[in-house]
Amino acid sequence: FFGSIIGALAKGLPSLISLIKK
C-alpha cells in the first residue's frame, strides 16, 4: 500500500519541480 503511494509521489515529484521551475 505505502509502496504505491511512494511510487505515485516519485512520479509526481518531477512534474511538480518542472511546474515550480516554470
UniProtKB/Swiss-Prot annotation:
It comes from the Eukaryota. This is Brevinin-1OKc. Antimicrobial peptide. Active against Gram-negative bacterium E.coli (MIC=6 uM) and against Gram-positive bacterium S.aureus (MIC=12.5 uM). Belongs to the frog skin active peptide (FSAP) family. Brevinin subfamily. Expressed by the skin glands. One of its GO terms (cellular component) is extracellular region. Keywords: Amidation, Antibiotic, Antimicrobial, Secreted. The keyword Kinase does not apply. It comes from Nidirana okinavana. It is found in: Secreted. One of its GO terms (biological process) is killing of cells of another organism. The modification Lysine amide is found at K22.
